[in-house]
């Protein structure tokens, strides 16, 4: 049998066929590229060189090249995952629960309006973790949750502050994609609770902002309602237009319209 570059290409593709890898063949240069689908990192194999080795070593030459390519791609994948961080992200409860049919995201309930998803972030790529990715990572759901919360606590924070009608509003807006994620940092919330004299109200209208407010009067509730609605409408990834009273580790949604209506009804009865 005469071995050609095309036959060698077919032989290598057969041996290196994996769902997470892609092949690209340059017939002019006689080069076969094998790369990871998600990162696009890969290996170029010059086929004439492999054919020349095959003329001497036959089957052993193909086995050696296939082994080299496989080990190199696996090493690249491990390096990429070791550099990646798992972080939690906050999403609306209306956000899709599946990446596609039969492949649900890894999720945790948070509040009546929000849910926690988990992202694999390697700085260059950002992907929500679903069951298939979880299997590739070789992690359990519990391990993902623990790693994500640990990494969330390492996120820095510096608030801007504004006071209106006696109410103080603190804004976090670093635009790192994880501003809303800081709502999961219990030590951050507790430190803010200690400096707040009135009701502690927290809002995550979209993923790139966290608002914490010290509300001391009804005007403050009206302001936080309008503010949250405005941010929600402008956000690239909106989460919820409702804000929450934070007390003893729990988030209670504030239904402003119902609150104001109740107040008005009380005046009319008086």
From Swiss-Prot:
<protein>
    <recommendedName>
        <fullName>UPF0354 protein BCQ_4506</fullName>
    </recommendedName>
</protein>
<dbReference type="InterPro" id="IPR010838">
    <property type="entry name" value="DUF1444"/>
</dbReference>
<comment type="similarity">
    <text>Belongs to the UPF0354 family.</text>
</comment>
<dbReference type="Pfam" id="PF07285">
    <property type="entry name" value="DUF1444"/>
</dbReference>
